[in-house]
Swiss-Prot record:
GO terms for molecular function: large ribosomal subunit rRNA binding; structural constituent of ribosome. Forms part of the ribosomal stalk, playing a central role in the interaction of the ribosome with GTP-bound translation factors. Part of the ribosomal stalk of the 50S ribosomal subunit. The N-terminus interacts with L11 and the large rRNA to form the base of the stalk. The C-terminus forms an elongated spine to which L12 dimers bind in a sequential fashion forming a multimeric L10(L12)X complex. GO terms for biological process: translation. The gene is rplJ. This is Large ribosomal subunit protein uL10. Keywords: Ribonucleoprotein, Ribosomal protein, RNA-binding, rRNA-binding. Gene3D superfamilies: 3.30.70.1730, 6.10.250.2350. Belongs to the universal ribosomal protein uL10 family. One of its GO terms (cellular component) is large ribosomal subunit. InterPro entries: Ribosomal_uL10, Ribosomal_uL10-like_sf, Ribosomal_uL10_bac, Ribosomal_uL10_bac_type, Ribosomal_uL10_CS_bac. HAMAP family: Ribosomal_uL10.
Length: 175
């Protein structure tokens, strides 16, 4: 049984609202996946904060129209699955990449980031982006390194002086 017009409009509005706020998107063909595998993928998407939706191609084109993911419409054919990253730019790509390791039936069509369309070969690059927490910790470590070096150098001067004086004292006592 097909979707009613109202259901289609609601789906387009829902996907459009998510696409408007999303950072990245991945489109994939799910042909060959069982219902159980799709359930696993959906559960993993919920855990990772990724919006995952099976959408008819025409509805998907309408949903992404006017968003930065409009560039993906050429790849909307066949059984289509859309994954949007809400908070972490690499989340959708990591989800699809990790799921593909176990299920080769999932075929990546396109990856979009910042209004630019990338091919499926860029999935790993997008998936390797650090999470927000990882990026912040790297930034903090980078900012902390010069200050820590300065503190170490500043503390080393008095220590070196004390060691030099101790060596002179030991030399005088020995003489």
């Amino acid at each position: 049984m097909g979707l009613s017009l109202e259901q289609k409009k609601a789906m387009v509005q829902e996907v459009a609202a998510v696409a408007q706020e999303a950072l990245t998107a991945v489109s994939a063909e799910y042909r060959g996946l069982t219902a159980g595998e799709m359930d696993q993928l959906r559960a993993q998407a919920r855990e990772q904060g990724v919006y995952l939706r099976v959408v008819k191609n025409t509805l998907a084109r309408r949903a992404v129209a006017g968003t930065e993911f409009e560039c993906m419409t050429e790849g909307f054919y066949g059984p289509l699955l859309l994954a949007f990253s809400q908070d972490d730019p690499g989340a959708a790509a990591r989800l699809v990449r990790d799921f593909r390791k176990k299920n080769e039936s999932l075929v990546v069509r396109n990856v979009a980031f910042g209004g630019t369309l990338y091919g499926p070969e860029h999935l790993d690059r997008l998936a390797s982006l650090p999470t927000r927490d990882e990026a912040l910790s790297k930034l903090m470590a980078t900012m902390r390194a010069p200050v820590q070096k300065l503190a170490t150098t500043t503390n080393e001067v008095p220590g070196k002086l004390v060691r030099t004086l101790a060596a002179v004292r030991d030399a005088k006592e020995a003489a």
